[in-house]
């Protein structure tokens, strides 16, 4: 394992959530390709295929590689302000969180994804018919992958 990746406290972190799995990466440059290959190879069987990714990051270094690999696998993106603009600048379509929630970003951009349509899509239990019926009733998209990092609160 790359020793610099274990430095603590990390200067920046990226959290990947995949259907109840969590991967924490501290060194984007070293792990980007490795982690994206892992995510795709271990999650892209038809039963666990990543179809939609919620992406909202402050530090965008290395994000282009992740987005490109996911786009190549047919993943659709859902994102917030600056991250959405970044994804679109790479030439990939991206749906705005605000369009899904019908609610604007508030408190200086710090509150964007705290909404039942977002959390419902992440927490939906795909094997439970009651959950599937509710997300269909409320038009909540399933969110299979979440990529976020920690906002530098000062």
Regions found by a protein language model. Name each.
Residues 4-7, 11-12, 27, 32, ...:
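Acidic, Ala/Val/Gly-enriched low-complexity intrinsically disordered segments
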Residues 22, 27-28, 36, 40, ...:
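N-terminal regions of proteins, emphasizing targeting and processing segments when present
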Residues 44-100:
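N-terminal glycine-/serine-/threonine-rich phosphate-binding loop
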Residues 20, 70, 138-139:
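Alpha-helix boundary/capping residues
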Residues 82-154:
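Glycine-rich nucleotide/cofactor/substrate-binding loop typically near the N-terminus or early
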């Amino acid at each position: 394992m790359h020793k610099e990746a274990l430095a603590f406290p990390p200067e920046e972190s990226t959290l990947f959530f995949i259907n109840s799995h969590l991967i924490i990466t501290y060194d984007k440059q070293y792990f980007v390709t490795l982690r994206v290959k892992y995510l795709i190879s271990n999650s892209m069987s038809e039963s666990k295929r990543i179809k939609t990714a919620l992406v909202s990051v402050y530090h965008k270094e290395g994000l282009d590689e992740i987005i490109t690999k996911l786009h190549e696998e047919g993943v659709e993106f859902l994102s917030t302000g600056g991250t959405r603009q970044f994804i679109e600048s790479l030439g990939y379509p991206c749906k705005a969180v605000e369009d899904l929630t019908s609610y604007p970003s508030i408190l200086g951009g710090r509150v964007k994804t705290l909404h039942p349509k977002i959390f419902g899509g992440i927490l939906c239990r795909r094997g439970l018919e009651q959950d599937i019926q509710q997300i269909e009733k409320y038009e909540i998209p399933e969110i299979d992958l979440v990529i976020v990092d920690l906002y530098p609160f000062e």
